[in-house]
Every structure is written in structure tokens, then in C-alpha cells.
């Protein structure tokens, strides 16, 4: 099946900025992550989203993709011996030009399938409260992974037996064939289909691991989450992925954070936003109110005549920057609440206020009137 357009996969335009691409990736990767989405095609969609992001987030890869699409010669031909933008390893129809160079130069540039390889990376989705993301925490997580089988010590063979050289490839991990072409006879080398390139054959497999040399287990990992992580961000824990193959280094663990929304606060970067309601009297006459922050309640002076939508900044009351570059602020946005149920006395006072001309009133008698309004709205006599 033909690959979908990467821009279409992420749901962005071809002129999308890096930030727009990153935001789309975070949203979709969270939506289709197999740990959260149990749909049958979730894993495949997640893989497709990740592949699209890896290309479009890299300026060089994106430029090639915009020019060639999925037919990019550097991508399609597998990244082997490259010259002038072409990879000779991709011409399988001609019997493999890569093998010509291996024949002439002894295969020095070829990595054997049985050589050391880095272990696979693991992903773990972690849910944090709003406060945990802001202040960080230390915790232990359990991650499913593969470990060396204790029964066979990684050999894959039944105790008392041992792996033997593959009879098909004679331990080389590759099979050789010759092919006649218009250019002459070409030698082809391919991964051995019997041993999968390991060069080994296990006559009697380990009953515990079934010959793989590894068993699935859950391991506990101590993780220190830095203060200031945001929804969709990742934390790389080096060396905590799957074990390496044939002596290679282990993979890495990537922790993807999912931050729960807060009932009062909203976050944008390192800044926090909240709305506070004010009564008509508080907005008109001014007041001192207490505003909740992540660091505790603080007093905020509301000047007389404050309007709905007025924003106040509480410096340094936001979220710490995850890279240690200071602290965000908290923005308090005022919403003046219009009363819906008024007593007769309150209605009379408001009518009197309207007759007196609203904001054109400045003398002392009008100040006393405002005090009456304030008391009436507070239920005082």
C-alpha cells in the first residue's frame, strides 16, 4: 500500500512551522500511543506518525522530502554506499551492485548481520498531575523488557547442549550465489534464511526462552522527573532499553509525559493563567483579594474601576523552566460577575446609581453611595 503524505499524517500544511509540526506530533502521538489507545490499528498509526515527525522535524530530511516525496533516492536505496545521492545497495534487480564492491574490496564496508547491535529503545507513558509536572518528582516505574535467560545464560540452547555452526551458511551468517547479467557474472551475498544471519544453529532449544536467549520481565527503574516538564515532552533515560545484540550496547528508555488538566490553572509554556470572579462592587470600588498560586495564596490589590478582562501579573509564580532558565509568571484575569438575583433594596440602589450618572459621579456624596452599594451586595444593612 502506498505511503500517506507526511503532512497529511500530521494534519499540517506544507508551510507549517517547526512549532506547528511539533505541536501536531505531540497531540497525535498521545492520541494513538498503544499504551493509551487500544484500537487494533493504533500501533501502526503511532509508527506512521513517528516516522512523519522524524522526517518533517529535520530540516535536511524535510527539504529532500519536499523535493522527492517518498521517492527520495537517499531514503529509498537504504543508506548504504552513497555517491552523488545514489545508494548502490538498492539495485536488487541487477543482483546487488553492493556485492560487486564487496567482492573487489573484501566487504570491508559491510556490517555483518551477526555484529554487535544496539538494543531496541523502549517507550513508557507516564501520567502526572499539574503540580507534579510543575515541581518534578522522584518515582519508581515498572517497565516490561527483555532480560538474558537465566536457564541458558543467553545461548538459547538447552542446558547441557550448545549452539552449533549453521550447516546452511557454515557459520558465516550469509549465503552466496552467482547471477549472470549482461554485465557478466555477479556474486550476491544475502543473509542466511536459516539462521537469520547469526551463523548459529540451535539443535535443542532452551525450554525457558524457546531458543531466543531472552525472557520477558518487568524491571523497576528509579526516575527523577525534572521540574517544569510539559504535556507531550519526553525524558530520555540512557541505557534502560532492551539489551544489546551480540555484545552491543543497550537501548534507551523514553518516558512520554501526559499532564492532567487543572481545575483552576491553565498553562502556556512556563506561564500559568487563571480567572478570578469579582462582584460588581469589588470591581467598581476596588478590593484586596486572595489568589491561589502553585506556591500558596497571595494577596492581590484590585484597583477601583477594574474591568472584565483586566490582567494582573504575579511575577515568578509560574512554572520553573525545565532547562533551568528561570521561572514563569502567573497571569490573573478578572471576570466581573453580573448578579442574577437582586433584592428590592439592591435594585433601588442600582436605579439610583443609574440616575446619578454612573462614572461621572465624583463628589463625596457619591462615594457614600458606593459604600451603600458595596454593603447591599454583601448583604449588610
UniProtKB/Swiss-Prot annotation:
Localization per record: Cytoplasm
GO cellular component terms, A-Z: cytoplasm
Location of the J domain: 5-69
Stored SUPFAM superfamilies: Chaperone J-domain (SSF46565), DnaJ/Hsp40 cysteine-rich domain (SSF57938), HSP40/DnaJ peptide-binding domain (SSF49493)
Pfam short name (any one): DnaJ_C
Listed GO MF terms: ATP binding; heat shock protein binding; unfolded protein binding; zinc ion binding
NCBIfam families: DnaJ_bact, PRK10767.1, PRK14276.1, PRK14280.1
Comment text on domains: The J domain is necessary and sufficient to stimulate DnaK ATPase activity. Zinc center 1 plays an important role in the autonomous, DnaK-independent chaperone activity of DnaJ. Zinc center 2 is essential for interaction with DnaK and for DnaJ activity.
GO biological process terms, semicolon-separated: chaperone cofactor-dependent protein refolding; DNA replication; protein refolding; response to heat
Cofactor requirements of the protein: Zn(2+)
Zinc finger CR-type: from-to: 136-218
Family, per entry: Belongs to the DnaJ family.
Manner of cofactor binding, per the entry note: Binds 2 Zn(2+) ions per monomer.
Quaternary organization: Homodimer.
Residues that bind Zn(2+) 1: 149, 152, 206, 209
CXXCXGXG motif repeat copies, ranges: 149-156, 166-173, 192-199, 206-213
UniProt-annotated stretches for the region Disordered: 154-174
Residues binding Zn(2+) 2, per UniProt: 166, 169, 192, 195
Keywords, comma-separated and alphabetical: Chaperone, Cytoplasm, DNA replication, Metal-binding, Repeat, Stress response, Zinc, Zinc-finger
CDD domains in the cross-refs: DnaJ, DnaJ_C, DnaJ_zf
Protein name in UniProt: Chaperone protein DnaJ
Cited function: Participates actively in the response to hyperosmotic and heat shock by preventing the aggregation of stress-denatured proteins and by disaggregating proteins, also in an autonomous, DnaK-independent fashion. Unfolded proteins bind initially to DnaJ; upon interaction with the DnaJ-bound protein, DnaK hydrolyzes its bound ATP, resulting in the formation of a stable complex. GrpE releases ADP from DnaK; ATP binding to DnaK triggers the release of the substrate protein, thus completing the reaction cycle.
Primary localization: cytoplasm
